[in-house]
Amino acid sequence: CAKIQIIYNFKQFILFFRLLCKKLTTNVMEKAKVYFTDFRTKANGDGLPTKLKNLIKKAGLADLDLEGKFVAIKMHFGELGNISYLRPNYARAVVDVVKELGGRPFLTDCNTLYPGSRKNALEHLYCAWENGFTPLTVGCPILIGDGLKGTDEVEVPVAGGEYVEKAKIGRAVMDADVFISLSHFKGHEEAGFGGALKNIGMGCGSTRGKAEMHESEKPAVHADQCVGCGVCAENCAHWA
């Protein structure tokens, strides 16, 4: 896999973001190429998916050697009842380009810590299917990166890691030859916003990895206020 800097802790994320902003404001950067397209769709099929294919080729995907390689396309399949995730059509556009280049793509994400529709591989897959992500719609298999219960992981040493010495990453992510992050911008209650960094740094973590990253927010029981209602136990996905 190509070397990617991963942020494993929200404190590190904020520090990294501040340093990045400082660098952007103090250094003279090379002008970026800006591409424009409209939202018009023509009868010949020249719509947004086709325009997206052209964009990712221009961005450099077409220059990669993908022949015969396993290509992990990391994305978020959305929770049930949520419609703010990327559409399957966009994932299909990336998959098609990877196939054109001889790659062997698969969509992937790792299980979540919190109770919901993505806390184990079975529910995660059903959630993805109901939200429109199926092998027929996206054109490739869907693999949950850290396995059935989030225990299929690889420990990756973090050089000089202050908070995490060994990151726990989903095995399917680490086994891939090429890694592509397909992410969307969203708000976050602690970091302010989430995008590509969170999609990789948090999203590729196994269940243990995510637990480690959230250690600063461990729940606690105030025994003097507990009434024994059991609501906390009902809402814990891991029976802690």
Q: Where would I find each of the regions flagged by the language model?
A:
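N-terminal and secondary-structure boundary signal
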Residues: 27-240
